[in-house]
């Protein structure tokens, strides 16, 4: 993929915004498991937007929010409450796809 074909940070941010709107719609319809998953996706794509902007390259194909925070060097700069929310959402990426992985949800 040539540099002109790289997804931009705007691309990732528009996907993140779409996921946020989807999470809000699911919250209104009480689809709570999927709200968590979409919130995870929102944060993941927002972090990938930061990565794309900072590195001028396609973000890695990972879904671990804690790892993405480290890659964009924000883990020490975000408010403690947001840091905790990100760590609470992190397992929902797997749990919503494979419900038997964590029956406590």
Per-segment meaning from a language model:
Residues 1-105:
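Terminal alpha-helical segments
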């Amino acid at each position: 993929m040539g540099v002109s074909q790289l997804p931009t940070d705007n691309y990732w941010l528009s996907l993140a915004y779409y996921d946020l709107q989807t999470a809000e719609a699911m919250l209104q319809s009480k689809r709570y498991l999927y709200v968590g998953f979409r919130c995870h996706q929102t944060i993941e794509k927002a972090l990938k937007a930061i990565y794309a902007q900072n590195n001028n390259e396609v973000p890695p194909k990972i879904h671990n929010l804690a790892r993405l925070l480290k890659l964009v060097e924000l883990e020490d700069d975000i408010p403690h409450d947001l840091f905790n929310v990100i760590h609470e959402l992190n397992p929902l990426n797997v749990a919503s796809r494979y419900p038997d992985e964590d029956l406590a949800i």
